[in-house]
Amino acid sequence: MNAVMTVDLSELDAWSAQVQRASDDLTGIARNGGHSLVQTDFGPILETMMGAYNALLPSVNQSLEDNGTGMRDHAEALRATARDFTLTEDGVVRRHNAHGVDARDGSSSFFDVAETTIRRAAPTETSLPQISFGFPYDTVCDLVRMLTGFDIRAELAEKIGGDVVGASMQGSSFGSLGTSMKGVAANLQSGGQTISKTWQGGAADAAVGQIGTWVASLDTQAAQLVQMGQNVVQICRDAWQTALAVVQCVKSAVQTVSAALATMSIPGVGWARVVQAVFQAFQAVMKAYQAIMKLINILKQVKSFIETVKNFFDGDKAPVSTATAPTATGAPGSVTRDPRSVATPTVGQRPVAVTA
């Protein structure tokens, strides 16, 4: 049975260059991730998810590094394949004592179809609203605790501190990296489709199939990164809004009790007004407490999602890049060509079908 193999070395050279660009892009993504996705402490307001988040980052960064390394190996394998074909051509020329002509004239078919520049990450939130501490606040806290047993400082104020600016910056970085990776996958897919038009045979099928595996892997990784970024950005927005709600509730409580304290010296009604105001303040701070509990429940859901993403990246391995190239040593018998092509070897041109 004869197997048909055709190759245009100009096209193969251009494709290996495109795969090398993809490797450079993936290396840049890994470098950016190493700088922007760092383990840290975003404070008590995001504390519920921080353990899972910090455990995720090493897995993500390792996968990003593996992508760059694996794609670089694949680009080198394609260059080796092109060299192999050239040696084979030279062997055929020597066998027939012919004059070889390298007709490679370059190729403009392998242009990138998607942008891979990593968008500069920026925070999506400003600093958290804060409670102004002072004598009125402490007085209200003491009165509420004395009459209700609820400590505003421990249950509210200390829980709304944190760095949502830095957290949302990292969320933005996740999205930028995922978007860039989608672009790399699109470029590889386009290149694989283009090379299939001029390179056929077992080696071509193996190399193009491997690129297809890469495209699927990168697309899946990119989707995880983008979703992760969206969730982090959203939880930062939720945290900011929760902090604002807490501050507004506490301010309302302070104003209510402060107004009552101003009338405490009135005989018969002063203390009663204070007690009534304290209970009104308690109702206000309980709304704030409920807002924090709602945020914590959302954080628990985000934590579960982060753990799922970590499991994905822990199990995700970059495709093994060992492109199956014909092992040609340049010996005359490596490839049997149509005799019509021997006098002027067709390196770099679209040749007649080669039988092997």
For the regions a protein language model found, what residue spans apply to each?
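Intrinsically disordered, low-complexity Pro/Gly/Thr/Ser/Ala-rich repeat tracts
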Residues: 1-173, 180-198, 210-213, 217-356
